[in-house]
């Protein structure tokens, strides 16, 4: 077996419509086709690929107290526009430059408390 990359991220939420709005309106993903599963959800796309899957759950269950997913990360193309968009959405975030590199990072949480890292690497 060889892992070739990350296919998608799945988030369980009891706030499906608001979570869709966050990923669509704040982070700029596009809502797209989703198989006709027997449960509610949404798939959000970037560059034609469904990278965020949302599943509506009455009581989402997080990781055990023995382990945790700290965050996941997206690459972004416009650092300043991203800061402007997050500020306009009245979201709290932390932004900083990675020492010794040209990488700039922004950390923000969605309404479910999921930590998202946004990485900007100038070309």
Feature-to-residue mapping (PLM):
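N-terminal beta-strand motif that seeds the catalytic metal site of vicinal oxygen chelate
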Residues: 1-17, 48, 69-72
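Vicinal oxygen chelate
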Residues: 1-2, 83, 88-123
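Exposed loop/turn and edge beta-strand positions of beta-sandwich/beta-sheet ligand-binding modules
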Residues: 5, 38, 68, 102
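Conserved catalytic-core motifs of GNAT/GCN5-like acyltransferases
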Residues: 10, 30-36, 96-99, 123
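Core segments of cupin and vicinal oxygen chelate
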Residues: 12-51
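A short, compositionally biased micro-patch
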Residues: 37, 47, 79, 99-101, ...
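Mid-chain, well-packed structural core segment of small domains
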Residues: 72-84
């Amino acid at each position: 077996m060889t892992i070739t990359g990350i296919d998608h991220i799945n988030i369980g939420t009891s706030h499906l419509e608001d979570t869709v709005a966050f990923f669509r309106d704040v982070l700029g993903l596009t809502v797209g086709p989703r198989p006709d599963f027997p449960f509610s959800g949404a798939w959000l796309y970037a560059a034609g690929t469904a990278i965020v899957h949302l599943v509506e759950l009455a009581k989402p269950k997080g990781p055990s107290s023995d382990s945790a997913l700290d965050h996941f990360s997206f690459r972004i193309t416009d650092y300043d526009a991203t800061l402007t968009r997050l500020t306009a959405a009245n979201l709290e975030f932390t932004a900083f430059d990675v020492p010794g590199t040209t990488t700039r990072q922004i950390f923000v949480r969605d309404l479910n408390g999921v930590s998202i890292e946004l990485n900007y690497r100038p070309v």
